[in-house]
């Protein structure tokens, strides 16, 4: 494990955590569709930090990138962090997850003991377990991040994804997230970026347009994506 590299990834995550957190009041004010924003890098920093510490410095040269947190990372702090997979496969457990500073009653944060699964996370980490068997072996080849760390909702608690934002505050958020992505790619010496879904792939292409690497994509494994459900969830793996 490269401890110096890991510390650089950690510091970049801290910078993203703080800069995006500072932008939340502006996003709430300017984005009519946004009422509540969670920042898992803050309240779920303990498991996120454990994820960085254990897996960012093991030599991965492939970066898999999602769009922003969903139910999984929103509870566990780990990208695509289906609670079951985080505890049983990644063996990140018994760590305090605090509460978001603003809460929506339909989006309760329980933490690592959240009993509700996340299908996308179960599929992503389940596939990596099939391929590499252990999280340590996985992290020698692939490291996973999200482009944006914020989990965002309207007044009804419906998920609002980053591409639905508009205006100056949206551009500011994209810029912060693009810069973090570029930093992680440079720190880790990444040579392949896999966008999970079209949005992630397009942001990678924008953020990394001046870098010599391969950018590709896979279908998003969400059950909301028809491709992800074809052949009982097997099709998207190909």
PLM region spans:
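Short, flexible loop segments at boundaries between secondary-structure elements
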Residues: 211-238
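A polyanion-binding, active-site-adjacent surface
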Residues: 2-192, 201-202, 216, 226
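Short, aromatic/basic amphipathic alpha-helical patches
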Residues: 204-210
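Active-site metal-binding loops of divalent metal-dependent hydrolases
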Residues: 68, 198, 221
């Amino acid at each position: 494990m490269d401890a110096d590299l890991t510390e650089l990834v950690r510091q970049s995550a801290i910078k993203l955590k703080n800069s995006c957190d500072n932008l939340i009041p502006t996003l709430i004010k300017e984005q009519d569709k946004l009422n509540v924003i969670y920042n898992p890098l803050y309240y779920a920093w303990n498991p996120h930090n454990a994820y960085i510490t254990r897996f960012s410095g093991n030599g991965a040269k492939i970066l898999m990138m999602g769009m922003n947190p969903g139910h999984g990372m929103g509870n566990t702090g780990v990208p695509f962090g289906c609670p079951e997979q985080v505890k049983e496969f990644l063996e990140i457990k018994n760590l305090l997850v605090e509460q978001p500073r603003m809460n929506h009653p339909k989006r309760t944060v329980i933490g690592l003991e959240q009993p509700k699964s996340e299908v996308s996370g179960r599929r992503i980490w389940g596939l990596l377990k099939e391929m590499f068997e252990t999280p340590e072996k996985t992290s020698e080849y692939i490291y996973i991040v999200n482009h944006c760390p914020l989990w965002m909702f309207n007044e009804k608690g419906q998920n609002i994804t980053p591409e639905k934002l508009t205006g100056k505050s949206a551009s500011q958020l994209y810029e912060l997230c693009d810069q973090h992505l570029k930093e992680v790619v440079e720190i880790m010496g990444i040579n392949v970026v896999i966008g999970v879904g079209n949005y992630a792939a397009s942001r990678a292409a924008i953020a990394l347009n001046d870098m010599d690497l391969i950018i590709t994509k896979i279908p998003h494994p969400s059950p909301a994506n028809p491709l992800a459900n074809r052949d009982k969830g097997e099709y998207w793996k190909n």
